[in-house]
Amino acid sequence: MVGAGEGDRVGGGAAVGGGQQFVDRSKVRILLCDSDPSSSREVLRLLCNCSYQVTCAKSPRQVINVLNCEAGEIDIILAEVDLPVSKCFKMLKYIARNKELRHIPIIMMSNRDEVSVVVKCLRLGAAEYLVKPLRMNELLNLWTHVWRRRRMLGLSEKNFFNDNFELALSEPSDANTNSTTLLSDDTDDKPKENINQETSTSNQHEYESNPSDAEPKQKGTPEGLLVSTEGGDQASSPGVMFSRPIKTNLRVAESSAFLAYVKSSTPTTSSFDSELQKGGNRLDSSDHRGNFSSTTDRSDTGTDVNIRDKEAFEMPVQYPVVCFSSSNLHLERSNEGQNDASGTPPVYHFPFYYPGMMDHGMTHPPVQNFQGNINNAQVHTPQTLLPQYNVYPQCHGVSMMPPFQYNPAGMSIQSNQLPTQNMWPQASSTPMPEETCSRSERRAAALAKFRLKRKERCFDKKVRYVNRKKLAETRPRVRGQFVRQANYTDITSTGDDISEDEDDDPSSREVEMVSSPE
């Protein structure tokens, strides 16, 4: 609810001068209006569990009569919307128009949660709209509406606070106690006393160890910065500042789930903090003795912090920078102090050759620039640690880099003692491949080839069996049938017989026909 935060602010701001004030809900009087008997009894029971004073009414007419008689004693009106609804809205209008009743906040409750009903109730002057079934934490914060309405109208505030701690709050085991109460009486001053004892003992140790330093601190510190302990320790160490920030004590009941969670999840003091504290004590003791040493013997305990490893984790990794120029090739080491302690000379990685990044006619640094001992280099540096570069194939159209010698930093090797694999290979005179034609030229060549192929096409009717066609052309056809050709010699020799028979039977005459192929 909106009023919960304001209620806490009121309760917290009222704690002045050692005494603490708490909300006394028994001073709040509520006028309950509900036409349903069962619902009215349930709401009445919840309000009584919250220690409110309740006056019941069954209709809007009874509410108006009670307000006309006891308007100054009613603090809150808790009414049902279905009285019916029309009479409920008339009651809201009547109370909003009456100047003597405007200071009473009206809280509506109903089983319905339609937006239209809620908006109309709020427009007619309702302070809040609650949906049944009501919850305990909603009813516990009803008194905040009274405080807000009076403050908004500029009226005098009612005293809802009680100085008596035991009368204001009940036992946490009771049924009428909820976790949303401002404070619980189960919180006593035991945790505060324990904290005060710890701080007082630590301050006492500091005062005993440095008695000469404590007096000027007290004299030079303004009164506003002095922190005095509470309870019985206030007189033991007055005016002594805490060596650490004050730990705020959250007052929560021991039976609450929050305290059980905090107890289970509170981490113990880490070993790293304890070791740092031990190291500070050792440094303080060494200052008093006047003995300063560069290293501290930490072999007595097995859990001491390795400062060297810690610095190694904290410092970022830095790499040597290799610089190139167009005139000469010079190597610059940006980190001189990051040498390995193992004794093996570091091998610095050279970048690959990129076309256009270095001049092909550059001068190479002589071998004498690298100072060192060839014997140490031969002992510590095997041949496998000397990589060879420029072994990757070069791009077409770019000449290879000429060979030059390179050595790890801190080594001086004669040219006759260098292995052959330490040389950059000379470029072989390989013929340059012809430049491939562009995409448009390839497309034009493909189109020309397609046109030539199209000209060679033949759209005539294809014959499947050529030999059969030739044989069919040589045979004569009569009415679609194949016939044999007649022999001319036989016809001439028997010409007379044929002429005689022609008159008698013309059908028996053999007719010579020459068929032409179709």
From Swiss-Prot:
Mark out the compositionally biased spans (Polar residues): 196-212
Indicate where this protein is primarily found.
nucleus
Recount the UniProt induction comment for this entry: Expressed with a circadian rhythm showing a broad peak in the late day.
Q: Which cysteines are joined by disulfide bonds?
A: none
Organism lineage reads as: Eukaryota, Viridiplantae, Streptophyta, Embryophyta, Tracheophyta
The annotated region (Disordered) lies at 172-241, 266-305, 483-518
SMART domains the UniProt entry points to: REC
Subcellular locations according to the entry: Nucleus
Protein purpose: Controls photoperiodic flowering response. Seems to be one of the component of the circadian clock. Expression of several members of the ARR-like family is controlled by circadian rhythm. The particular coordinated sequential expression of PRR73, PRR37, PRR95, PRR59 and PPR1 result to circadian waves that may be at the basis of the endogenous circadian clock.
Name the GO terms of the biological process aspect: cytokinin-activated signaling pathway; phosphorelay signal transduction system; rhythmic process
* Organism of origin: Oryza sativa subsp. japonica (Rice)
Q: Which family does it belong to?
A: Belongs to the ARR-like family.
| Subunit annotation | Interacts with PIL13. Interacts with PIL15.
Question: Where is each Response regulatory domain found?
Answer: 29-147
Gene label? PRR1
* Full protein name: Two-component response regulator-like PRR1
Alphabetically sorted, this entry's keywords are: Biological rhythms, Nucleus, Transcription, Transcription regulation, Two-component regulatory system
**InterPro entries xrefs:** ARR-like (IPR045279), CCT_domain (IPR010402), CheY-like_superfamily (IPR011006), Sig_transdc_resp-reg_receiver (IPR001789)
